[in-house]
Amino acid sequence: MYVPAHFREEDLVNIHTLVRTNPFGMLLTNSEKVPEVTHLPMMLDAGESKDSILGHLALANPHTQKIIDGTDALAVFSGIHAYISPRWYVDTNQVPTWNYQVVHAQGTLNRIEDPRLLIRLLDELSHEHESGSKKPW
């Protein structure tokens, strides 16, 4: 993704905040013809040396069947965005643009096959996304 240097965000606190406040993202992997894409809620697990993105795909999802350990992937999280009119500038020699916040997280996927670990992951995901509710599930 092209990001002009003056818009590039390097502060991990800001990057983590965008991911945590916009957890519904896209998981993309390569396939033979076109990229595979699944929209799903995910969760950031910020580690001391590296970060992980946790998520769950249903077994019935065809994308799931194409994922093996070590599959390269891209997770995309979108924040706020807005059209920018050239009328808003003092200098009228401008063109329209679009400002946006987005995080592209690249990494490799690991399947969780152990039922106990899978249940723990689902519990963590549910807890993360239920935590803002008055009566969590």
State where each predicted segment sits:
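Binding-site signature for planar aromatic cofactors or substrates
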Residues: 1-137
